[in-house]
C-alpha cells in the first residue's frame, strides 16, 4: 500500500505556531464558521502518483493528540487561555474532512469543515506531502548533507556581513511546510541554535518545545480571507480582521500580515490606532524593498518612529537575500527574517516543492487572496475578485490560480 506505513507526524505540535494562535481566536470568536481549503502546486509537477501514500498519512493523522507534557508546555506560555487548551487536549484530526483525488496526474486535495478544525490541516499536511515526495525522489540524502550545506551558507553569510554591524540581525525558522523531512528540519534548527547566534525562534511548536526556542508566528492569509465573508461589509473586512485579532491578543502577537488584498489596500486600513497597537508588519509577496519603504513612509506619515516598529520579511528568503534587506533597512527600522524552504530543504540536487494549501470558501461563499505578486493570487470566483477590487479600489488583477 505504502512505501512506509509508519506515521510521518508524531506530534500535534509539529505545525506552525500561528495555526494554534489563529485556532484559539477562531475558537473564541467564530466556532461555528465553516470553510474549505484547497491544495495548489505552483509548478506543473504531477504529484498524483503519491495520492495513496498521502491518504494513508491523512488517516494516521487522526491518531495525533496533545500529550500531557505538551499541554503543560502550552499552558506555560502567555498566549493561551484555559478554555481553548482544554478543548485542544480533546482535539483530533478528522480524516473524513480531507478529499484526495487525482486528475490528469495532478494531485487535488480539498479540506472542508468547521474552521476551528480545518485550520489545523494545512501545515502538517504540506509537510507530509513534501516528505513523501522527497523520500521517494531523493533516497540517498542524509542529514549530514543538509548540515554541510547549512554550514557552507553560514560561512558565506559571515564573510558577506563582516563589514557591517550584524548584531541586530534576527533569524526565525519558518521551514515546516516545505521541509525535506522532519528529521532534517530538527537537525538544521538544532545546528542553527548551536552555531548561529542570530537565531531568535522557530515557527514550529514541537521544535520550540524540544529545543527550548521561542515559538513565533501571528496570523496567516486565511485570517483575513475568512473575514471577507464574516464581515457584514466587504470593504471593512480587513479592518474587522485587524480589530478582532487585537481583541484576542491585545498585548502580544502583534505582527500584521499585509498582502492578502495588497499592501496599498492594507495601508489604507492601517490607521494610527492600528499602527500604534500592532508591533509591526510582515512581508510575504511583492518587491521587499518597495514594500519596506512604503511601511516606513506610512509610519512616518502617522508620526510614529519606525525604530520602535518591526518589519518581518518571509517571502522566499535565503540568508543572502536577508542580508541584502538588512543592509538596506537596519539603521531605519527593526528587522526579523523568516526563512523556510532555503533552510529545511536546501540540499544539493534536491528541488523543493512549491506547494500551498489556501482557503477558497467561508460559509460556502468565495474568498480570495490577491497578494502583491500576481502569481500568488488565489480565487475560484472571478466575480468575487471583481467585488474585492471594487471594494478596495484595486487595479486589475493580472492572474489568478
From Swiss-Prot:
TM spans (from-to): none
Pfam families according to UniProt: NAPRTase (PF04095), NAPRTase_N (PF17767)
Assigned keywords, A-Z: Ligase, Phosphoprotein, Pyridine nucleotide biosynthesis
InterPro entries, alphabetized: N/Namide_PRibTrfase, NAPRTase_N, Nic_PRibTrfase, Nic_PRibTrfase-Fam, Nicotinate_pribotase-like_C
PTM description: Transiently phosphorylated on a His residue during the reaction cycle. Phosphorylation strongly increases the affinity for substrates and increases the rate of nicotinate D-ribonucleotide production. Dephosphorylation regenerates the low-affinity form of the enzyme, leading to product release.
Task of the protein: Catalyzes the synthesis of beta-nicotinate D-ribonucleotide from nicotinate and 5-phospho-D-ribose 1-phosphate at the expense of ATP.
UniProt name for this protein: Nicotinate phosphoribosyltransferase
Organism whose genome encodes this protein: Yersinia pestis
